[in-house]
Amino acid sequence: MSEFDRLTDPATMKGLSFEEQTYEVSRRLAALTRRRFLAGSGALLATAGAAMPAFAQRKGGNLRIGRSSDPDTLDPQKTTSFTSHETFTQIFDGMVMRDEKGNVLPHLALSWEFQNDNKRVVFKLRPDVVFHDGTPLNAEAVAFTVKRHLDPATASPTKFICGPLTHAEVIDDLTIAYVYSAPFVTLWVGLGGAYQAILSPAAVQKLGNDFGRNPVGSGPFKFEKWQPDSGIKLVRNDKHMFINKRFKNDKPAHLDSIEYVVIPEDAPRLAALQSNEIQVIAGFNAVPLDKLAQVKRMRNVKLMQRTALSCFGLCFNTKLTPTSDLKVRQALSMAIDKNKVMQLALGGNGELAYSPLGPAFPQVLPNAKELAPKYDPAKAKALLQEAGATNLKLRLSTGDDGANRRACEVIQAELKAVGVEVAIEAVPGAEAAVIGRKGEHPLYMLNYRYTDGDVLHILLHKTGALNRGFYTDPRTDDLLDKQRLEFDPKKRDAMINEVQKIAIEQCWWLPLYADVTAVAIRDTVQDFENAWDARIYYKDVWLKA
């Protein structure tokens, strides 16, 4: 255990309140800072509440980012993890990017042309791009990446993002065609994210299954090392010189390096920010939403927040008894006060949801609230009696981050009030995903972030990668397939609305709330953007004196 881990270990602070833990860790880290300084280590770290300069110039420096958990892998084709995506977004480049209005921005692809009734897209690639291992990023590399993503042997959980993509065809060294079996209106959602980023063929072939622990891309930062349950270090890629409208900087990143530091517990993580052991807390659930008031009171710390394109909800497993019964699903939905869940899980920092499509999505069903089951414990008890579902004992699987744990504890108490006993199984996010895919529990806490209503295909289609309720409904599948082919926005939105109506009527989900994307940064951190799509890029970030 490192000195930092030892000083922030919650086991040494048993019996202390959250605020007392934060203070105690701040005190310890301040003492550590003084010892480092007196020992001549050169680590000029500001003590809690002080405004001591961290770095003296725009170029250079190491940025330390606090997070709650480790990724499961850094192979973009082998995970759906938010934490992984946050990391390999820095390491890899995608074909395009998108702005807040949905406009498609050139990135690796400088231009594109739709052909063959929108079933073929020809991309012109940026010249002179190389991977971190020195090999060229050309059409062959793109074709290799696509082939691997689609290969059943890869068993990619993000293959669904590719839609009806069948293969990529090399035209010349800098021209590549993506060939689809049908028009695919949401292709930019995937191509604009890191799950479809371009991989180094040489590195994949050399490393095999170890590629996810030693990723090689072409992005603004290169992978250097990974110490499990401790942190990941990336260093600047001095050959990343290109720009699009999401980047201000057309030269290599300002920072020498960035480190992701794993601090599982909220109080030590906030204390590390207060004492300048870390300069940023960012990423999924990294800033505890029930503690935003405390973060706002921190000196020399800036809190950035915005409503997320997200939804947190309780999935009912329709292949298991008793949640295969619609009356039971309705009863469980009516027994839970989702406002109470949001207040205690997020400190009220969210927006209630009534559809599996989160409230911040433009395509959310306008009358979802009117159609959704109302909180009514008495009616919930009556429905359980009608269904013959008495003395129920159910297992609820969830990731072990603070917000999800708190939400599940409220759900547990609410269901106990109507005679349902719930055993919570809280495990690290990667393990929870495995449990969810196996479908061994009747209840599963699920959340997502996405940028388009096509997320319903992922959640509710029989082939959906996040269909944790194992729903199978031919009409829903047909609508979800057709909306992917419909280029008329009004017609497509009508299909997405119809799917939401079915999902609400069938109680496949109990939508709870959308959270906010919250980031806390030291005031030395400049040009940091809390982006609309929750994708954080560190290429523009710099540290001031």
Q: What are these regions, as identified by a protein language model?
A:
Residues H167-A168, E224-V235, V261-L320, Q343, ...:
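Extracellular/periplasmic solute-recognition and catalytic clefts
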Residues M1-L32, A46-T47:
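N-terminal secretory signal peptides
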Residues G66-N116, K147, V216:
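N-terminal lobe/hinge region of extracytoplasmic solute-binding protein
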Residues N138-K147, D173-V179, G219-P220, P252-S257, ...:
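Alpha-helical secondary-structure segments
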Residues K119, K327, E421-A432, H457-D523, ...:
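Extracytoplasmic/peripheral linker and loop segments enriched in polar/acidic and small residues
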Residues F221, E351-E386, A403-R406:
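Structural transition elements
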Residues K124, K159-A203, N209, P220-Q227:
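Surface-exposed binding/hinge segments that line
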Residues E100-N103, G192-E259, A267-P268, P377-A378, ...:
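Gly/Pro-rich hinge or "lid" segments in bacterial periplasmic/extracellular proteins
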